[in-house]
């Protein structure tokens, strides 16, 4: 009798749920036609009283790469923050549920005179609609850009050897690059591990660790073909590329070939997850930079 009542209650409870919630989260992931969810990763206070909010996403499809243009199906409110978000949502599989997440894909800064403002990102796709509010109200979501336990810091990125530097998820933007359909264009940057590990010689084998670089389309009509878009830290180490001092910079590049004209933004993500006090998920340990590209016919 108890089992029957529990089963009946479960069926009734399920029947009361909206259709899109009956499948989630216990249903298997689909190859295609599944949801893309916006995710609020956390916030960082700034010295001037402003707040930087970090967002990522999860594409639950096992195979389908989803593109959602900016507009009624992919927007941020208040409108002044709209446009920073990605339109291209690759499939990630880094193990476990959290492994499908792409964390810290972009960030927005809420000025001090807008303190308390919620920044809401909405995505509509495949019959699903999800909105996530970014709030700087809970210390649970507050993040630090300070050193990790053994001195690791977010890597540095520059587009010119002596140019502006990114050490954050909000990142910097390169000068716009122009190319044409089918004509490969070189995208390049300088990267550096900023770790301060001299005080931890017994725990940290190296003062500076090889970095991982990943070039990915952030916005655009169709993803370009990249020549070696992802270079892992272990690949870089095997090639003999190491950093011996705090002044050393590594030049990295890829070649991108676009098949359709339009306006694009390419994101470069640089991470130092090889360090012993760093791992994927740690917001400390990667930085973003963005390259706007115009592709003509």
Short names for language-model regions:
Residues 11-15:
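Sec/Tat signal peptide C-region and signal peptidase I cleavage site
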Residues 51-57:
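Short, well-ordered beta-strand segments enriched in hydrophobic/aromatic residues
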Residues 17-24, 30-46, 57-59, 67-72, ...:
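Extracellular/lumenal mature domains of secreted and surface-exposed proteins
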Residues 2-10:
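Bacterial N-terminal signal peptides
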Residues 62:
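Short, acidic Gly/Pro/Ser/Thr-rich loop/turn segments
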Residues 103-126:
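Helix-rich interaction surfaces within compact, conserved domain-sized segments
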Residues 66-103:
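Acidic, aromatic-enriched beta-alpha/helix-loop junctions
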Residues 94-107, 246-252:
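Aromatic sugar-binding surface patches on proteins
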């Amino acid at each position: 009798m108890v089992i029957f009542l529990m089963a009946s209650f479960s069926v009734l409870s399920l029947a009361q749920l909206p259709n899109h919630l009956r499948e989630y989260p216990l249903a298997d992931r689909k190859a295609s036609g599944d949801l893309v969810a916006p995710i609020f990763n956390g916030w960082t206070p700034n010295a001037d009283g402003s707040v930087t909010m970090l967002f990522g996403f999860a594409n639950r499809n096992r195979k389908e790469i989803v593109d959602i243009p900016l507009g009624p199906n992919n927007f941020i409110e208040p409108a002044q923050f709209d446009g920073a978000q990605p339109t291209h949502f690759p499939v990630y599989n880094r193990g476990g549920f959290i492994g499908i997440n792409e964390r810290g894909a972009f960030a927005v800064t809420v000025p001090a005179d807008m303190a308390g403002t919620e920044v809401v990102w909405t995505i509509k796709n495949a019959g699903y609609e999800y909105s996530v509010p970014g709030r700087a109200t809970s210390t649970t979501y507050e993040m630090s850009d300070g050193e990790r336990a053994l001195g690791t810091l977010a890597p540095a990125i520059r587009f010119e050897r002596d140019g502006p530097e990114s050490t954050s998820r909000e990142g910097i933007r390169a000068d716009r690059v122009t190319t044409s359909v089918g004509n490969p264009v070189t995208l390049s940057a300088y990267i550096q591990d900023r770790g301060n590990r001299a005080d931890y010689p017994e725990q940290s084998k190296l003062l500076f660790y090889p970095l991982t670089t990943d070039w990915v389309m952030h916005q655009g009509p169709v993803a370009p073909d990249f020549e070696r878009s992802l270079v892992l830290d272990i690949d870089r180490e095997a090639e003999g590329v190491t950093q011996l001092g705090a002044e050393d910079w590594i030049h990295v590049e890829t070649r991108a070939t676009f098949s359709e004209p339009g306006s694009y933004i390419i994101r470069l993500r640089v991470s130092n997850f090889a360090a012993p006090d760093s791992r994927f998920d740690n917001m400390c340990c990667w930085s973003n930079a963005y390259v706007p590209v115009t592709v003509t016919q």
